[in-house]
Swiss-Prot record:
Residues 1-19 form the signal peptide. Gene3D superfamilies: Pheromone/general odorant binding protein domain (1.10.238.20). This is Pheromone-binding protein Gp-9. The lineage of its organism: Eukaryota, Metazoa, Ecdysozoa, Arthropoda, Hexapoda. It comes from the Eukaryota. The gene is Gp-9.
Amino acid sequence: MKTFVLHIFIFALVAFASASRDSAKKIGSQYDNYATCLTEHSLTEDDIFSIGEVSSGQHKTNHEETELHKNGCVMQCMLEKDGLMSGADYDEEKMREDYIKETGAQPGDQRIEALNACMHETKDMEDKCDKSLLLVACVLAAEAVLADSNEGA
């Protein structure tokens, strides 16, 4: 019994450490064009918001509008270089395909529904940088809510 409890404790600790590590990562840092887009926009990794900050919405209250815009421009740069955006326009089908490939989501998965809702919510925005950050923030927040609801189930 002690061994079983120890295994559960270790599993919980590893899961918590993994979630904490992911939330500390910078948004977009896992993608190929991250460094290129930082350079193109004269930013450093220190200028970019963390996943945890964005998924919780803290980036909106902790930073100035110019910082929000710059982060959005880096996101838009990466989306455009990956063929998911052209200017301020999404390629919605390609965005869904890439998201499914990246997350392993299956048809009917709530994450795909969240992506669709986020694209719909932001589709009429004209500023490509603000639009990109809002899309990323919307998806990350939805994923966090879904992860929390799945943990409670």
